Amino acid sequence: MSLSRSEEMHRLTENVYKTIMEQFNPSLRNFIAMGKNYEKALAGVTFAAKGYFDALVKMGELASESQGSKELGDVLFQMAEVHRQIQNQLEETLKSFHNELLTQLEQKVELDSRYLSAALKKYQTEQRSKGDALDKCQAELKKLRKKSQGSKNPQKYSDKELQYIDAISNKQGELENYVSDGYKTALTEERRRFCFLVEKQCAVAKNSAAYHSKGKELLAQKLPLWQQACADPNKIPDRAVQLMQQMANSNGSILPSALSASKSNLVISDPIPGAKPLPVPPELAPFVGRMSAQENVPVMNGVAGPDSEDYNPWADRKAAQPKSLSPPQSQSKLSDSYSNTLPVRKSVTPKNSYATTENKTLPRSSSMAAGLERNGRMRVKAIFSHAAGDNSTLLSFKEGDLITLLVPEARDGWHYGESEKTKMRGWFPFSYTRVLDSDGSDRLHMSLQQGKSSSTGNLLDKDDLALPPPDYGTSSRAFPTQTAGTFKQRPYSVAVPAFSQGLDDYGARSVSRNPFANVHLKPTVTNDRSAPLLS
Protein backbone atom coordinates (compact mmCIF):
# COMPACT_ATOMS: atom_id res chain seq x y z
CA MET A 1 0.00 0.00 0.00
CA SER A 2 1.41 3.36 -1.05
CA LEU A 3 1.69 6.24 1.35
CA SER A 4 -1.08 8.20 -0.37
CA ARG A 5 -3.38 5.19 0.00
CA SER A 6 -2.62 4.98 3.70
CA GLU A 7 -3.36 8.66 4.19
CA GLU A 8 -6.68 8.32 2.37
CA MET A 9 -7.70 5.40 4.59
CA HIS A 10 -6.68 7.41 7.63
CA ARG A 11 -9.03 10.21 6.58
CA LEU A 12 -11.86 7.69 6.07
CA THR A 13 -11.28 6.32 9.57
CA GLU A 14 -11.45 9.77 11.11
CA ASN A 15 -14.63 10.52 9.14
CA VAL A 16 -16.31 7.38 10.49
CA TYR A 17 -15.59 8.39 14.08
CA LYS A 18 -16.72 11.95 13.44
CA THR A 19 -19.92 10.71 11.76
CA ILE A 20 -20.77 8.67 14.85
CA MET A 21 -20.10 11.55 17.22
CA GLU A 22 -21.53 14.40 15.17
CA GLN A 23 -24.48 12.73 13.41
CA PHE A 24 -25.38 9.35 14.89
CA ASN A 25 -25.39 10.36 18.55
CA PRO A 26 -27.41 13.58 18.05
CA SER A 27 -29.90 11.67 15.90
CA LEU A 28 -30.11 9.00 18.59
CA ARG A 29 -30.82 11.64 21.24
CA ASN A 30 -33.62 13.00 19.07
CA PHE A 31 -34.97 9.48 18.62
CA ILE A 32 -34.99 9.01 22.41
CA ALA A 33 -36.82 12.30 22.88
CA MET A 34 -39.47 11.31 20.34
CA GLY A 35 -39.73 7.92 22.04
CA LYS A 36 -40.44 9.62 25.35
CA ASN A 37 -43.20 11.63 23.72
CA TYR A 38 -44.62 8.42 22.28
CA GLU A 39 -44.42 6.76 25.69
CA LYS A 40 -46.22 9.69 27.27
CA ALA A 41 -48.97 9.49 24.67
CA LEU A 42 -49.39 5.75 25.26
CA ALA A 43 -49.58 6.37 29.00
CA GLY A 44 -52.36 8.89 28.35
CA VAL A 45 -54.18 6.33 26.23
CA THR A 46 -53.84 3.78 29.04
CA PHE A 47 -55.29 6.21 31.57
CA ALA A 48 -58.18 7.12 29.28
CA ALA A 49 -58.83 3.44 28.53
CA LYS A 50 -59.23 2.69 32.24
CA GLY A 51 -61.87 5.38 32.57
CA TYR A 52 -63.55 4.17 29.40
CA PHE A 53 -63.85 0.59 30.57
CA ASP A 54 -64.90 1.62 34.07
CA ALA A 55 -67.81 3.39 32.41
CA LEU A 56 -68.48 0.26 30.34
CA VAL A 57 -68.64 -1.79 33.53
CA LYS A 58 -71.18 0.64 34.99
CA MET A 59 -73.31 0.23 31.88
CA GLY A 60 -73.07 -3.53 32.35
CA GLU A 61 -74.23 -3.16 35.95
CA LEU A 62 -77.27 -1.23 34.77
CA ALA A 63 -78.10 -3.87 32.18
CA SER A 64 -77.64 -6.72 34.65
CA GLU A 65 -80.28 -5.21 36.93
CA SER A 66 -82.86 -5.40 34.14
CA GLN A 67 -85.08 -8.45 33.67
CA GLY A 68 -85.02 -7.99 29.90
CA SER A 69 -81.31 -7.20 29.37
CA LYS A 70 -79.48 -9.24 32.00
CA GLU A 71 -77.53 -11.28 29.45
CA LEU A 72 -76.48 -8.07 27.71
CA GLY A 73 -75.07 -6.92 31.03
CA ASP A 74 -72.99 -10.11 31.10
CA VAL A 75 -71.82 -9.35 27.56
CA LEU A 76 -70.75 -5.85 28.60
CA PHE A 77 -68.85 -7.34 31.55
CA GLN A 78 -67.09 -9.75 29.18
CA MET A 79 -66.23 -6.89 26.84
CA ALA A 80 -64.73 -4.91 29.68
CA GLU A 81 -62.75 -7.93 30.89
CA VAL A 82 -61.41 -8.78 27.42
CA HIS A 83 -60.38 -5.22 26.76
CA ARG A 84 -58.84 -5.06 30.23
CA GLN A 85 -56.64 -8.03 29.33
CA ILE A 86 -55.74 -6.40 26.03
CA GLN A 87 -54.96 -3.18 27.87
CA ASN A 88 -52.74 -5.08 30.31
CA GLN A 89 -50.82 -6.47 27.36
CA LEU A 90 -50.47 -2.95 26.01
CA GLU A 91 -49.06 -1.86 29.36
CA GLU A 92 -46.51 -4.67 29.15
CA THR A 93 -45.55 -3.45 25.70
CA LEU A 94 -45.20 0.05 27.11
CA LYS A 95 -42.94 -1.20 29.91
CA SER A 96 -40.80 -3.07 27.39
CA PHE A 97 -40.61 0.03 25.25
CA HIS A 98 -39.39 2.05 28.22
CA ASN A 99 -37.02 -0.46 29.82
CA GLU A 100 -35.58 -2.27 26.82
CA LEU A 101 -35.34 0.60 24.38
CA LEU A 102 -35.44 4.11 25.76
CA THR A 103 -33.57 3.52 29.02
CA GLN A 104 -30.75 1.49 27.48
CA LEU A 105 -30.36 3.80 24.50
CA GLU A 106 -30.19 6.79 26.81
CA GLN A 107 -27.48 5.14 28.88
CA LYS A 108 -25.53 4.10 25.79
CA VAL A 109 -25.57 7.50 24.15
CA GLU A 110 -24.19 9.19 27.26
CA LEU A 111 -21.34 6.70 27.62
CA ASP A 112 -20.72 6.51 23.90
CA SER A 113 -19.83 10.16 23.46
CA ARG A 114 -16.95 9.86 25.93
CA TYR A 115 -15.86 6.47 24.62
CA LEU A 116 -15.70 7.57 20.99
CA SER A 117 -13.75 10.69 21.85
CA ALA A 118 -11.17 8.60 23.69
CA ALA A 119 -11.03 5.98 20.91
CA LEU A 120 -10.52 8.58 18.20
CA LYS A 121 -7.84 10.33 20.23
CA LYS A 122 -6.01 7.05 20.84
CA TYR A 123 -6.13 6.15 17.16
CA GLN A 124 -4.88 9.53 16.06
CA THR A 125 -2.03 9.47 18.62
CA GLU A 126 -0.89 6.00 17.61
CA GLN A 127 -1.14 6.77 13.92
CA ARG A 128 0.85 9.96 14.40
CA SER A 129 3.52 8.13 16.40
CA LYS A 130 3.97 5.49 13.74
CA GLY A 131 4.02 8.09 11.02
CA ASP A 132 6.65 10.11 12.87
CA ALA A 133 8.85 7.01 13.26
CA LEU A 134 8.56 6.32 9.54
CA ASP A 135 9.39 9.90 8.66
CA LYS A 136 12.45 9.79 10.96
CA CYS A 137 13.81 6.66 9.30
CA GLN A 138 13.28 8.19 5.89
CA ALA A 139 15.14 11.35 6.98
CA GLU A 140 18.07 9.26 8.32
CA LEU A 141 18.25 7.32 5.05
CA LYS A 142 18.32 10.54 3.10
CA LYS A 143 21.22 11.90 5.17
CA LEU A 144 23.09 8.63 4.81
CA ARG A 145 22.81 8.72 1.05
CA LYS A 146 24.13 12.27 0.92
CA LYS A 147 27.17 11.19 2.92
CA SER A 148 27.79 8.20 0.68
CA GLN A 149 27.66 10.35 -2.41
CA GLY A 150 30.35 12.75 -1.07
CA SER A 151 32.56 10.04 0.36
CA LYS A 152 35.61 8.57 -1.37
CA ASN A 153 34.62 5.14 -0.18
CA PRO A 154 30.83 4.86 -0.64
CA GLN A 155 30.85 1.11 -0.02
CA LYS A 156 31.22 1.53 3.70
CA TYR A 157 27.70 3.16 3.84
CA SER A 158 25.98 0.50 1.79
CA ASP A 159 25.31 -1.88 4.70
CA LYS A 160 23.94 0.87 6.87
CA GLU A 161 21.79 2.13 4.02
CA LEU A 162 20.27 -1.33 3.62
CA GLN A 163 19.44 -1.37 7.33
CA TYR A 164 17.56 1.95 7.03
CA ILE A 165 15.71 0.73 3.99
CA ASP A 166 14.56 -2.39 5.89
CA ALA A 167 13.54 -0.27 8.88
CA ILE A 168 11.56 2.12 6.68
CA SER A 169 9.81 -0.78 4.99
CA ASN A 170 8.85 -2.31 8.36
CA LYS A 171 7.60 0.96 9.80
CA GLN A 172 5.60 1.74 6.70
CA GLY A 173 3.97 -1.70 6.88
CA GLU A 174 3.15 -1.17 10.54
CA LEU A 175 1.59 2.19 9.78
CA GLU A 176 -0.48 0.81 6.94
CA ASN A 177 -1.66 -2.14 9.02
CA TYR A 178 -2.56 0.12 11.90
CA VAL A 179 -4.52 2.48 9.66
CA SER A 180 -6.30 -0.46 8.07
CA ASP A 181 -7.15 -1.93 11.47
CA GLY A 182 -8.28 1.48 12.67
CA TYR A 183 -10.64 1.87 9.75
CA LYS A 184 -12.02 -1.61 10.36
CA THR A 185 -12.48 -0.79 14.05
CA ALA A 186 -14.28 2.45 13.20
CA LEU A 187 -16.69 0.68 10.85
CA THR A 188 -17.27 -2.00 13.48
CA GLU A 189 -18.09 0.62 16.12
CA GLU A 190 -20.56 2.24 13.76
CA ARG A 191 -22.21 -1.06 12.89
CA ARG A 192 -22.42 -2.14 16.53
CA ARG A 193 -24.40 0.98 17.35
CA PHE A 194 -26.88 0.50 14.55
CA CYS A 195 -27.21 -3.20 15.43
CA PHE A 196 -27.92 -2.31 19.05
CA LEU A 197 -30.68 0.05 17.96
CA VAL A 198 -32.21 -2.55 15.64
CA GLU A 199 -31.96 -5.26 18.32
CA LYS A 200 -33.83 -3.17 20.90
CA GLN A 201 -36.41 -2.15 18.36
CA CYS A 202 -36.94 -5.83 17.53
CA ALA A 203 -37.62 -6.54 21.21
CA VAL A 204 -40.26 -3.83 21.21
CA ALA A 205 -41.73 -5.18 17.97
CA LYS A 206 -41.87 -8.67 19.49
CA ASN A 207 -43.88 -7.42 22.46
CA SER A 208 -46.09 -5.44 20.12
CA ALA A 209 -46.72 -8.58 18.06
CA ALA A 210 -47.66 -10.45 21.25
CA TYR A 211 -50.04 -7.62 22.16
CA HIS A 212 -51.82 -7.71 18.81
CA SER A 213 -51.83 -11.52 18.72
CA LYS A 214 -53.45 -11.77 22.15
CA GLY A 215 -56.00 -9.10 21.25
CA LYS A 216 -56.87 -10.92 18.04
CA GLU A 217 -57.18 -14.25 19.86
CA LEU A 218 -59.46 -12.87 22.58
CA LEU A 219 -61.66 -10.88 20.23
CA ALA A 220 -61.97 -13.67 17.66
CA GLN A 221 -63.12 -16.02 20.42
CA LYS A 222 -65.69 -13.69 22.02
CA LEU A 223 -66.91 -11.48 19.19
CA PRO A 224 -69.33 -13.99 17.58
CA LEU A 225 -71.02 -14.58 20.95
CA TRP A 226 -71.37 -10.84 21.53
CA GLN A 227 -72.86 -10.31 18.10
CA GLN A 228 -75.30 -13.15 18.67
CA ALA A 229 -76.42 -11.64 21.99
CA CYS A 230 -77.51 -8.37 20.35
CA ALA A 231 -78.76 -9.83 17.07
CA ASP A 232 -82.45 -9.52 18.00
CA PRO A 233 -83.19 -6.44 20.15
CA ASN A 234 -86.93 -7.19 20.08
CA LYS A 235 -86.61 -10.62 21.68
CA ILE A 236 -87.61 -10.86 25.34
CA PRO A 237 -85.64 -13.41 27.39
CA ASP A 238 -87.47 -16.51 28.58
CA ARG A 239 -86.74 -15.49 32.15
CA ALA A 240 -88.76 -12.30 31.78
CA VAL A 241 -91.60 -14.15 30.03
CA GLN A 242 -91.76 -16.68 32.86
CA LEU A 243 -91.74 -13.84 35.37
CA MET A 244 -94.70 -12.21 33.66
CA GLN A 245 -96.55 -15.53 33.61
CA GLN A 246 -95.86 -16.02 37.31
CA MET A 247 -97.18 -12.55 38.04
CA ALA A 248 -100.31 -13.22 36.00
CA ASN A 249 -100.92 -16.51 37.81
CA SER A 250 -100.28 -15.11 41.30
CA ASN A 251 -102.39 -11.90 40.99
CA GLY A 252 -99.36 -9.61 40.84
CA SER A 253 -97.13 -11.04 43.60
CA ILE A 254 -93.55 -11.35 42.42
CA LEU A 255 -90.28 -12.50 43.85
CA PRO A 256 -88.16 -10.04 45.84
CA SER A 257 -85.34 -10.45 43.31
CA ALA A 258 -87.41 -8.60 40.72
CA LEU A 259 -87.72 -5.60 42.96
CA SER A 260 -84.04 -4.74 43.17
CA ALA A 261 -83.87 -2.61 40.04
CA SER A 262 -84.84 0.70 41.58
CA LYS A 263 -83.33 0.19 45.04
CA SER A 264 -79.62 0.60 44.30
CA ASN A 265 -79.59 4.38 44.22
CA LEU A 266 -81.49 5.20 47.43
CA VAL A 267 -79.53 7.69 49.49
CA ILE A 268 -81.65 7.05 52.59
CA SER A 269 -81.87 3.54 54.03
CA ASP A 270 -84.26 1.15 52.28
CA PRO A 271 -87.71 1.45 53.89
CA ILE A 272 -88.83 -2.03 52.82
CA PRO A 273 -86.24 -4.68 53.80
CA GLY A 274 -87.01 -7.91 52.02
CA ALA A 275 -89.79 -6.25 49.94
CA LYS A 276 -92.48 -7.07 52.52
CA PRO A 277 -95.99 -5.80 51.72
CA LEU A 278 -97.44 -2.99 53.78
CA PRO A 279 -100.04 -3.77 56.44
CA VAL A 280 -103.59 -3.29 55.20
CA PRO A 281 -105.82 -1.01 57.28
CA PRO A 282 -109.08 -2.81 58.08
CA GLU A 283 -111.12 0.12 56.78
CA LEU A 284 -109.69 -0.26 53.25
CA ALA A 285 -109.25 -4.03 52.98
CA PRO A 286 -112.46 -4.71 50.96
CA PHE A 287 -111.72 -1.82 48.65
CA VAL A 288 -108.16 -2.99 47.94
CA GLY A 289 -109.17 -6.58 47.36
CA ARG A 290 -111.65 -5.50 44.71
CA MET A 291 -109.22 -3.20 42.95
CA SER A 292 -106.34 -5.70 42.94
CA ALA A 293 -108.57 -8.32 41.34
CA GLN A 294 -109.67 -6.03 38.52
CA GLU A 295 -106.32 -4.63 37.34
CA ASN A 296 -105.78 -5.89 33.82
CA VAL A 297 -104.05 -3.08 31.95
CA PRO A 298 -101.89 -1.19 34.46
CA VAL A 299 -100.30 2.12 33.62
CA MET A 300 -96.76 2.79 34.83
CA ASN A 301 -95.83 6.29 35.84
CA GLY A 302 -98.73 7.76 33.88
CA VAL A 303 -97.63 6.31 30.50
CA ALA A 304 -99.77 3.88 28.54
CA GLY A 305 -98.64 0.31 28.00
CA PRO A 306 -98.01 -1.30 24.62
CA ASP A 307 -99.20 1.64 22.52
CA SER A 308 -96.88 4.20 24.07
CA GLU A 309 -93.98 4.63 21.68
CA ASP A 310 -93.46 8.36 21.99
CA TYR A 311 -89.88 7.99 23.14
CA ASN A 312 -87.96 5.09 21.66
CA PRO A 313 -84.83 6.47 19.97
CA TRP A 314 -82.90 3.18 20.26
CA ALA A 315 -85.39 1.08 18.28
CA ASP A 316 -83.71 0.80 14.88
CA ARG A 317 -86.12 -1.81 13.67
CA LYS A 318 -89.47 -2.96 15.07
CA ALA A 319 -90.63 -6.53 14.59
CA ALA A 320 -94.23 -7.56 15.06
CA GLN A 321 -94.68 -8.95 18.56
CA PRO A 322 -97.65 -10.04 20.63
CA LYS A 323 -98.67 -7.12 22.77
CA SER A 324 -98.94 -9.36 25.78
CA LEU A 325 -95.16 -9.86 25.67
CA SER A 326 -94.09 -6.30 24.85
CA PRO A 327 -91.52 -4.72 27.20
CA PRO A 328 -93.77 -1.80 28.27
CA GLN A 329 -96.49 -4.17 29.37
CA SER A 330 -94.01 -6.37 31.23
CA GLN A 331 -92.76 -3.30 33.03
CA SER A 332 -96.28 -2.27 33.91
CA LYS A 333 -97.08 -5.71 35.27
CA LEU A 334 -93.91 -5.58 37.29
CA SER A 335 -94.89 -2.22 38.70
CA ASP A 336 -98.43 -3.48 39.30
CA SER A 337 -97.16 -5.54 42.23
CA TYR A 338 -94.09 -3.45 42.98
CA SER A 339 -95.65 -2.00 46.10
CA ASN A 340 -98.62 -3.14 48.13
CA THR A 341 -99.10 0.32 49.63
CA LEU A 342 -102.75 1.10 50.13
CA PRO A 343 -104.89 2.43 48.57
CA VAL A 344 -103.87 0.90 45.20
CA ARG A 345 -104.56 2.72 41.96
CA LYS A 346 -107.05 1.11 39.65
CA SER A 347 -105.92 1.49 36.05
CA VAL A 348 -108.30 0.81 33.18
CA THR A 349 -108.12 0.79 29.42
CA PRO A 350 -108.17 4.11 27.55
CA LYS A 351 -111.63 3.30 26.17
CA ASN A 352 -113.39 3.70 29.51
CA SER A 353 -110.87 5.59 31.62
CA TYR A 354 -110.44 9.30 31.45
CA ALA A 355 -107.72 9.14 34.06
CA THR A 356 -105.55 7.11 31.70
CA THR A 357 -105.93 9.76 29.04
CA GLU A 358 -104.89 12.36 31.56
CA ASN A 359 -101.87 10.31 32.50
CA LYS A 360 -100.77 10.09 28.90
CA THR A 361 -100.90 13.83 28.64
CA LEU A 362 -99.45 14.57 32.05
CA PRO A 363 -97.13 11.72 33.04
CA ARG A 364 -95.37 13.75 35.73
CA SER A 365 -96.08 13.29 39.40
CA SER A 366 -98.32 16.06 40.67
CA SER A 367 -98.98 14.77 44.16
CA MET A 368 -96.74 17.59 45.40
CA ALA A 369 -99.07 20.27 44.07
CA ALA A 370 -100.65 20.86 47.45
CA GLY A 371 -99.59 20.85 51.08
CA LEU A 372 -96.52 23.10 50.78
CA GLU A 373 -95.58 25.32 53.68
CA ARG A 374 -93.85 28.66 53.36
CA ASN A 375 -90.44 26.99 53.56
CA GLY A 376 -91.28 24.64 50.68
CA ARG A 377 -91.80 21.47 52.82
CA MET A 378 -95.01 19.50 52.36
CA ARG A 379 -96.97 18.46 55.44
CA VAL A 380 -99.28 15.48 55.75
CA LYS A 381 -101.63 14.29 58.47
CA ALA A 382 -101.85 10.66 59.58
CA ILE A 383 -105.25 9.08 58.98
CA PHE A 384 -104.12 5.68 60.32
CA SER A 385 -101.67 4.70 63.02
CA HIS A 386 -98.39 3.06 62.01
CA ALA A 387 -95.91 1.15 64.20
CA ALA A 388 -92.28 0.74 63.12
CA GLY A 389 -91.62 -2.31 65.29
CA ASP A 390 -87.96 -3.33 65.43
CA ASN A 391 -87.08 -1.58 62.16
CA SER A 392 -85.11 1.56 62.98
CA THR A 393 -85.58 2.97 59.47
CA LEU A 394 -89.37 3.28 59.77
CA LEU A 395 -91.36 6.07 61.43
CA SER A 396 -94.03 5.39 64.03
CA PHE A 397 -97.01 7.71 64.41
CA LYS A 398 -100.58 7.80 65.58
CA GLU A 399 -103.73 8.95 63.88
CA GLY A 400 -103.85 12.73 63.71
CA ASP A 401 -100.07 13.29 63.93
CA LEU A 402 -98.53 15.83 61.54
CA ILE A 403 -95.51 14.82 59.46
CA THR A 404 -93.16 17.05 57.43
CA LEU A 405 -91.90 15.40 54.23
CA LEU A 406 -88.11 15.54 53.72
CA VAL A 407 -87.81 14.06 50.21
CA PRO A 408 -89.52 15.36 47.06
CA GLU A 409 -91.33 12.17 46.00
CA ALA A 410 -92.48 8.87 47.46
CA ARG A 411 -90.53 5.73 46.62
CA ASP A 412 -92.39 2.46 46.10
CA GLY A 413 -95.31 3.77 48.17
CA TRP A 414 -93.09 4.96 51.05
CA HIS A 415 -92.26 8.52 51.98
CA TYR A 416 -89.53 9.89 54.24
CA GLY A 417 -90.41 12.54 56.78
CA GLU A 418 -90.17 13.88 60.32
CA SER A 419 -92.92 13.66 62.91
CA GLU A 420 -93.69 17.11 64.29
CA LYS A 421 -94.74 15.52 67.56
CA THR A 422 -91.82 13.17 68.31
CA LYS A 423 -89.19 14.86 66.08
CA MET A 424 -88.24 11.37 64.82
CA ARG A 425 -87.41 10.71 61.17
CA GLY A 426 -88.03 7.63 59.08
CA TRP A 427 -89.96 5.97 56.27
CA PHE A 428 -93.74 5.59 56.49
CA PRO A 429 -96.52 4.36 54.16
CA PHE A 430 -97.67 7.39 52.19
CA SER A 431 -101.20 5.99 51.86
CA TYR A 432 -101.62 6.20 55.65
CA THR A 433 -101.53 10.01 55.44
CA ARG A 434 -103.57 12.88 54.04
CA VAL A 435 -101.96 15.91 52.37
CA LEU A 436 -102.56 19.22 54.14
CA ASP A 437 -103.50 22.26 52.09
CA SER A 438 -101.71 25.56 52.53
CA ASP A 439 -104.47 26.82 54.85
CA GLY A 440 -103.95 23.93 57.26
CA SER A 441 -107.04 21.91 56.24
CA ASP A 442 -106.53 18.30 55.24
CA ARG A 443 -107.88 16.31 52.36
CA LEU A 444 -107.85 12.66 51.42
CA HIS A 445 -104.81 11.83 49.30
CA MET A 446 -104.45 8.64 47.38
CA SER A 447 -100.93 7.52 46.48
CA LEU A 448 -101.12 6.10 43.02
CA GLN A 449 -97.72 4.51 43.15
CA GLN A 450 -96.08 2.45 40.46
CA GLY A 451 -92.31 2.78 40.64
CA LYS A 452 -92.71 6.43 41.79
CA SER A 453 -95.56 8.48 43.27
CA SER A 454 -98.13 9.66 40.74
CA SER A 455 -101.55 11.03 41.64
CA THR A 456 -104.18 10.94 38.93
CA GLY A 457 -106.51 13.12 40.96
CA ASN A 458 -103.93 15.90 41.11
CA LEU A 459 -102.66 15.75 37.55
CA LEU A 460 -104.37 19.03 36.73
CA ASP A 461 -102.97 20.74 39.86
CA LYS A 462 -106.40 21.34 41.41
CA ASP A 463 -106.25 21.54 45.17
CA ASP A 464 -109.95 20.83 45.76
CA LEU A 465 -110.09 17.34 44.21
CA ALA A 466 -111.20 14.28 46.14
CA LEU A 467 -110.44 10.58 45.74
CA PRO A 468 -111.54 9.12 42.36
CA PRO A 469 -113.81 6.07 42.23
CA PRO A 470 -112.03 2.78 41.60
CA ASP A 471 -113.51 2.07 38.19
CA TYR A 472 -115.40 4.35 35.83
CA GLY A 473 -117.01 1.56 33.88
CA THR A 474 -117.95 -1.05 36.49
CA SER A 475 -121.16 -1.36 38.41
CA SER A 476 -121.43 0.35 41.74
CA ARG A 477 -122.86 -2.68 43.50
CA ALA A 478 -119.39 -4.24 43.71
CA PHE A 479 -118.02 -1.15 45.49
CA PRO A 480 -118.50 -1.22 49.28
CA THR A 481 -120.53 1.60 50.79
CA GLN A 482 -118.37 4.10 52.69
CA THR A 483 -119.29 6.97 54.92
CA ALA A 484 -118.55 10.50 53.80
CA GLY A 485 -115.93 10.93 56.50
CA THR A 486 -114.07 7.74 55.56
CA PHE A 487 -114.12 7.52 51.78
CA LYS A 488 -115.75 10.03 49.44
CA GLN A 489 -116.53 9.54 45.79
CA ARG A 490 -115.20 12.08 43.32
CA PRO A 491 -118.20 13.93 41.78
CA TYR A 492 -118.49 14.40 38.05
CA SER A 493 -115.16 14.96 36.31
CA VAL A 494 -112.18 16.53 38.05
CA ALA A 495 -110.47 17.05 34.73
CA VAL A 496 -112.80 19.71 33.30
CA PRO A 497 -113.47 23.07 35.01
CA ALA A 498 -116.95 23.22 33.39
CA PHE A 499 -118.13 20.46 35.71
CA SER A 500 -116.79 22.05 38.90
CA GLN A 501 -120.32 23.01 39.96
CA GLY A 502 -120.84 19.38 40.80
CA LEU A 503 -118.52 19.84 43.75
CA ASP A 504 -121.16 21.91 45.55
CA ASP A 505 -123.75 19.19 45.79
CA TYR A 506 -121.75 16.01 45.78
CA GLY A 507 -122.47 15.51 49.48
CA ALA A 508 -126.16 15.10 48.70
CA ARG A 509 -125.47 12.38 46.15
CA SER A 510 -125.53 8.73 47.05
CA VAL A 511 -122.04 7.33 47.43
CA SER A 512 -123.26 3.88 46.41
CA ARG A 513 -123.98 4.97 42.82
CA ASN A 514 -121.33 5.44 40.15
CA PRO A 515 -122.00 8.81 38.42
CA PHE A 516 -119.58 7.91 35.59
CA ALA A 517 -121.41 4.80 34.43
CA ASN A 518 -122.66 6.52 31.25
CA VAL A 519 -119.67 8.77 30.55
CA HIS A 520 -117.95 8.32 27.19
CA LEU A 521 -114.62 9.97 26.61
CA LYS A 522 -114.04 12.09 23.56
CA PRO A 523 -110.84 10.86 21.83
CA THR A 524 -108.25 13.55 21.31
CA VAL A 525 -104.57 13.78 20.50
CA THR A 526 -104.07 17.29 21.83
CA ASN A 527 -103.23 18.53 25.29
CA ASP A 528 -106.27 20.83 25.58
CA ARG A 529 -107.88 18.64 28.30
CA SER A 530 -111.18 18.52 26.46
CA ALA A 531 -114.34 17.84 28.43
CA PRO A 532 -115.85 14.33 28.25
CA LEU A 533 -118.91 13.86 26.10
CA LEU A 534 -121.91 13.00 28.29
CA SER A 535 -124.63 10.89 26.68
UniProtKB/Swiss-Prot annotation:
Residues 349-368, 447-458 have a biased composition (Polar residues). One of its GO terms (molecular function) is identical protein binding. One of its GO terms (biological process) is Rho protein signal transduction. Gene3D superfamilies: Arfaptin homology (AH) domain/BAR domain (1.20.1270.60), SH3 Domains (2.30.30.40). The modification Phosphothreonine is found at T341, T361. Residues 375-438 form the SH3 domain. One of its GO terms (cellular component) is filopodium. It is found in: Cytoplasm; Membrane; Cell projection, Filopodium; Cell projection, Ruffle. CDD domains: I-BAR_IMD_IRSp53 (cd07646), SH3_Irsp53 (cd11915). Residues 299-370, 445-477 are annotated as: Disordered. Phosphorylated on tyrosine residues by INSR in response to insulin treatment. SMART domains: SH3. Residues 321-335 have a biased composition (Low complexity). Residues 88-153 form a coiled coil. Keywords: Cell projection, Coiled coil, Cytoplasm, Cytoskeleton, Membrane, Phosphoprotein, SH3 domain. Detected in liver, brain, olfactory bulb, brain cortex, caudate putamen, hypothalamus and cerebellum. It comes from the Eukaryota. Transmembrane segments: none annotated. The modification Phosphoserine is found at S262, S324, S326, S337, S347, S367, S385, S396, S455. Residues 1-250 form the IMD domain. It is a peripheral membrane protein. Adapter protein that links membrane-bound small G-proteins to cytoplasmic effector proteins. Necessary for CDC42-mediated reorganization of the actin cytoskeleton and for RAC1-mediated membrane ruffling. Involved in the regulation of the actin cytoskeleton by WASF family members and the Arp2/3 complex. Plays a role in neurite growth. Acts syngeristically with ENAH to promote filipodia formation. Plays a role in the reorganization of the actin cytoskeleton in response to bacterial infection. Participates in actin bundling when associated with EPS8, promoting filopodial protrusions. Homodimer. Interacts with CDC42 and RAC1 that have been activated by GTP binding. Binds DIAPH1. Interacts with ATN1, ADGRB1, SHANK1, SHANK2, SHANK3, TIAM1, WASF1 and WASF2. Interacts with ENAH after recruitment of CDC42. Interacts with EPS8. The IMD domain forms a coiled coil. The isolated domain can induce actin bundling and filopodia formation. In the absence of G-proteins intramolecular interaction between the IMD and the SH3 domain gives rise to an auto-inhibited state of the protein. Interaction of the IMD with RAC1 or CDC42 leads to activation. The SH3 domain interacts with ATN1, ADGRB1, WASF1, WASF2, SHANK1, DIAPH1 and ENAH. This is BAR/IMD domain-containing adapter protein 2. It comes from Mus musculus.
